[in-house]
Amino acid sequence: MTVANHARPIRRALLSVSDKTGILEFAKALHAQGVELLSTGGTARLLADNGVPVIEVSDYTGHPEIMDGRVKTLHPKVHGGILARRGLDENVMAANNINAIDLVAVNLYPFADTVAKAGCTLEDAIENIDIGGPTMVRAAAKNHKDVTIVVNAADYNRVLAEMAVNNGSTTHATRFDLAIAAFEHTAGYDGMIANYFGTMVPMHRVPAHSTDECFQDSLSVEGSKFPRTFNTQLVKKQDLRYGENSHQAAAFYVDTKIDEASVATAVQLQGKALSYNNIADTDAALECVKEFSEPACVIVKHANPCGVALGKDLLDAYNRAYQTDPTSAFGGIIAFNGELDAATASAIVERQFVEVIIAPVVSQGARDVVAKKTNVRLLECGQWNTKTQTLDYKRVNGGLLVQDRDQGMVGLDDIKVVTKRQPTESELKDLMFCWKVAKFVKSNAIVYAKDGMTIGVGAGQMSRVYSAKIAGIKAADEGLEVVNSVMASDAFFPFRDGIDAAAAAGISCIIQPGGSMRDAEIIAAADEHGMAMVMTGMRHFRH
């Protein structure tokens, strides 16, 4: 029999879990198949209290748990039984009174849950660092040729089902797969611990060998939000046909610790497989539309919003968003912040070619409509309530830039009017709409908007004035009236030329962060043109 299908019978199992979900049922099923059960502490008490025959590990080894339970399973009879190579180590086992342990079911102390609690002390964290658990897990995973390791309650039934059809045995293929999961489990666990303690290392902003006087204070006695070594664990959701370009291999990994509605949580209801670019663009569209509470639609092309609008309903919002730039909307990604209905879905598929449509909920009527266009990727991401504070990553050659996700957003109470003219109520409403859109446009970003609808988007230009000019050109190309519309800039204006270009186009009001050394000149230019201007004090660069 080859290793590929070599079955190993399970006659003795060691069960020791912190998360006791399903463990009682698992133990009963193992006992019913004649498996001898070893266990520790709370797990052993749970089994015994429910009438499941179990041997305490301390009784099995002849050595009591010591040091308040810090040492329970670190014993040759335990680890020898797990690590013993069947057909090779029997003489050693017999000489040392060691019995083979064929299955290990272990999950670890809840370190992440503990340190996430308000008021968690260093001592609390230390006492929730599991020692014996990871040791047993790694031992069983190492010896997966002979031992079955289970670290996830979701795999209990899988093991039982395989035992049922293999005369109480598991196959090598299953043991190998479970061993990989075990190593992933311990790697993630140790990574969490390293990250937690790594934030206690003094902050370090520049290389220690730097002699530049301006960096003499680069070391701080305070800890850092970011650990000395950065450990994260992502799970592969799917392999992709290729990456950003066809010569690049790619895959999509997700952070399973985050449950906020996103492209990562989305379920694909129909359509071709998502591509690398589809996923990136869908993320940009969805995160933008999540900024709005009113019915909203965002159309994205190459990671930039090309049309964003509010409406009395989603159909109205889509029609208005499409109107901004029908040319760029071709082959775009469309995101909504409400339930996609049949009427809106019909308008989309009858009007344009679309790569992806995503919404928190998709009605059955909308599904039936889109089903007629089999290539359209239709995604349902679920409702979002709050946003999770996560990290953003940017790969550079030889390293990784890590920062907080940009969740900043100002309200009417946060902005400051800096010009002689005050914005009108309708202008203020459009300013806030426009500012939310600008946050998701590649820098340098300029957005023109009017009545809750973008009328021109200038994205990704090296000079801000050219982004302003492009926004005006876009509006003119679509026959959209710029006069008395508002403008948002993701960062400050370094010169007055951007203000002059906006005035020439007919812009009446501007929202921008401020902070330029020429702010006074910029404000004077706005006053000269009779424009209103507000400053947010918050920048939204996007690269």
From Swiss-Prot:
Listed GO biological process terms: 'de novo' IMP biosynthetic process
Catalytic activity: (6R)-10-formyltetrahydrofolate + 5-amino-1-(5-phospho-beta-D-ribosyl)imidazole-4-carboxamide = 5-formamido-1-(5-phospho-D-ribosyl)imidazole-4-carboxamide + (6S)-5,6,7,8-tetrahydrofolate; IMP + H2O = 5-formamido-1-(5-phospho-D-ribosyl)imidazole-4-carboxamide
Pathway note: Purine metabolism; IMP biosynthesis via de novo pathway; 5-formamido-1-(5-phospho-D-ribosyl)imidazole-4-carboxamide from 5-amino-1-(5-phospho-D-ribosyl)imidazole-4-carboxamide (10-formyl THF route): step 1/1; Purine metabolism; IMP biosynthesis via de novo pathway; IMP from 5-formamido-1-(5-phospho-D-ribosyl)imidazole-4-carboxamide: step 1/1
Gene3D superfamilies in UniProt: 3.40.140.20, Methylglyoxal synthase-like domain
GO cellular component, one term: cytosol
Single GO term (MF): phosphoribosylaminoimidazolecarboxamide formyltransferase activity
Keywords: Hydrolase, Multifunctional enzyme, Purine biosynthesis, Transferase
Catalytic activity, EC: 2.1.2.3, 3.5.4.10
Domain MGS-like as annotated: residue spans: 5-151
HAMAP family: PurH
Membership in a protein family: Belongs to the PurH family.
Comment, domains: The IMP cyclohydrolase activity resides in the N-terminal region.
Name of the protein in its database record: Bifunctional purine biosynthesis protein PurH
